[in-house]
């Protein structure tokens, strides 16, 4: 047997032994360090490399798959929130505000005119999502199928999928390309080949793999009523809006191409349409300074003109080929020292209210491409350690959600209570209802309810209407058709949250109707609760419900 053949035989033997030891440990109710086990068995058998997790998962007998897969799952955080997130990229295209300002933002890498010419705007082409998109030649169907297969091989459930459409300003692309892109995302889940977005959505609604939502990255100038209407037809439920700074002078100096006033107007319109609003913010921009950075985040969370539902923190990076790189090279811009940046991020995280989710704390750009800026690949961990040292707590949604708590702290909720928080934001009355264990500060499920303002442009939301902008029960993914007593999805928390939302809408808001901005794949769930399709929303009349 040649060397290659003998290595293959050793690999098969090693995988069999590892699986056998895993089954023994499971039967004896023992925990196993998989990395250590792989190392020991591979070394014992004279294998020159460790077997891949995908191969070990493939070697697990079918009668042990259900019990062993959760223990073998790679990066369990990927589906800890109850959803498999699939990030896809649109084709490279120029940023639309070049036509008005003559150039892109000073810090922005990537795009067709950059040193990274195969990348989309604001990406380098070396981020994991970018590389998957380039391999698939930016084909949305291939990107989706490839990522789903990858997640399944790593032991994750892909029963509930949320898409994030990245790669510049998607809504600035031609309508026929946008329709093609969205159609293929839905078709990749349903297996059907559709001729229109409407047909794709109809098949996706009944698909085994449910599209529970689509998130689209955009800019305030591409969040006008016509854009909001188009995104509703796509099945979009969440917007990621690039804000970067709450200061008008910084927006002007960095060449953003829009004002902060337009950001506030966008938030108002988006929330009155039912969308969840996540914003991108960049600490350490030129001409800001540490104190102004702290003040803008205080304003972001406390001013009713902002108050986003989610936040992506992207500390400024200096990357070759950008205007900022030239400023840095000539000494006109200097990044915060690493310790100062960690302190700033820790301060920002301590300010986050309990109804806001911090999705990211840094960009996915590989460190070798960064000339100056973030020096830690795990900035969130450093910031959390600093908070612990200072006696501060991060109370954002992600830190408290039950799936993350189980993975990181091995704690489960005991005394669960219904908790309500009210606040005003963007011209409307917001109510954040949640099921939590207040003693351990663990979040199990949440609902965002809004009393629509009189500025709503959608006909379905005019008059006395309340809208549910988000309903989410956390914990690792459970199939829509299954119930698992150890997991929190499908335990009735969702319907209890909806009952409370209906009561508040009827008795306190004085609303005649309650609407839900629902992902395409979750419409059937709302039908069971007495809701009907009302344009792109699921709605219920409250007067008849009360009777």
Swiss-Prot record:
One of its GO terms (molecular function) is metal ion binding. Acetyl-CoA binds at residues 160, 470-473, 493-495, 526. It comes from the Eukaryota. The keyword Metal-binding applies. The keyword Metal-binding applies. Residues 392-547 form the N-acetyltransferase domain. Residues 78-368 form the Radical SAM core domain. Transmembrane segments: none annotated. Binds 1 [4Fe-4S] cluster. The cluster is coordinated with 3 cysteines and an exchangeable S-adenosyl-L-methionine. Its cofactor is [4Fe-4S] cluster. Pathway: tRNA modification; 5-methoxycarbonylmethyl-2-thiouridine-tRNA biosynthesis. It holds the Pfam family ELP3_N. Keywords: 4Fe-4S, Acyltransferase, Iron, Iron-sulfur, Metal-binding, RNA-binding, S-adenosyl-L-methionine, Transferase, tRNA processing, tRNA-binding. It catalyses: uridine(34) in tRNA + acetyl-CoA + S-adenosyl-L-methionine + H2O = 5-(carboxymethyl)uridine(34) in tRNA + 5'-deoxyadenosine + L-methionine + CoA + 2 H(+). GO terms for cellular component: cytoplasm; elongator holoenzyme complex; nucleus. [4Fe-4S] cluster binds at residues 95, 105, 108. GO terms for biological process: embryonic morphogenesis; olfactory learning; oocyte development; regulation of transcription by RNA polymerase II; spermatogenesis; translation; tRNA wobble base 5-methoxycarbonylmethyl-2-thiouridinylation; tRNA wobble uridine modification. Disulfide bonds: none annotated. Signal peptide: none annotated. Its EC number is 2.3.1.311. Catalytic tRNA acetyltransferase subunit of the elongator complex which is required for multiple tRNA modifications, including mcm5U (5-methoxycarbonylmethyl uridine), mcm5s2U (5-methoxycarbonylmethyl-2-thiouridine), and ncm5U (5-carbamoylmethyl uridine). In the elongator complex, acts as a tRNA uridine(34) acetyltransferase by mediating formation of carboxymethyluridine in the wobble base at position 34 in tRNAs. Belongs to the ELP3 family. Component of the elongator complex. This is Elongator complex protein 3. It comes from Caenorhabditis elegans.
